[in-house]
Regions:
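Ribonuclease/tRNase effector modules and their secretory precursors
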Residues: 1-136
């Protein structure tokens, strides 16, 4: 599997409030550029929209330690979505038969491995940013 080298560092800090506010500010910056749902255009999917709001719903299902761990890689994940042309691992979602899961691998500027998951609806071809998490 090829890995995308990100040019952006992960968020620094250990406090949840600090990291959450930094990540949320990034999300709001993107949100102000769109009329409806915030999205990023993906280089791999031929500049298709990847909607970002589903990530936040998914994040609230995790405990606070896991949220911090995932939010640290949020800027790296956005960079990967926008610029990566590397082939992901794609498979059918075992929980929903009408979805495909795409898993991209990336390295932060600090050389730390992380993964980004994007779901694609087979009927509507709509793609959503589901999750970002480090290797461990």
């Amino acid at each position: 599997m090829k890995v995308y080298q990100s040019k952006i560092k992960k968020l620094a800090g250990t406090d949840y409030k600090e990291i959450h506010s930094l990540a949320e500010n990034l999300y709001k910056q993107i949100g102000t550029k769109t009329k409806r749902r915030p999205y990023a255009r993906s280089a791999y999917f031929n500049k298709d929209k990847i909607f970002l709001d589903y990530f936040w719903r998914h994040l609230w299902q995790k405990n606070w330690r896991d949220r911090v761990r995932r939010l640290k890689y949020y800027p790296c994940a956005l960079d990967l979505i926008k610029n990566s042309k590397t082939e992901p691992i794609s498979k059918q979602n075992p929980n929903k038969s009408n979805e495909i899961l795409h898993r991209f691998a990336g390295l932060s500027k600090d050389k730390e491995l992380f993964f980004v998951q994007i779901t694609e609806d087979k009927k509507t071809n709509q793609k959503s940013f589901l999750s970002v998490f480090p290797e461990q």
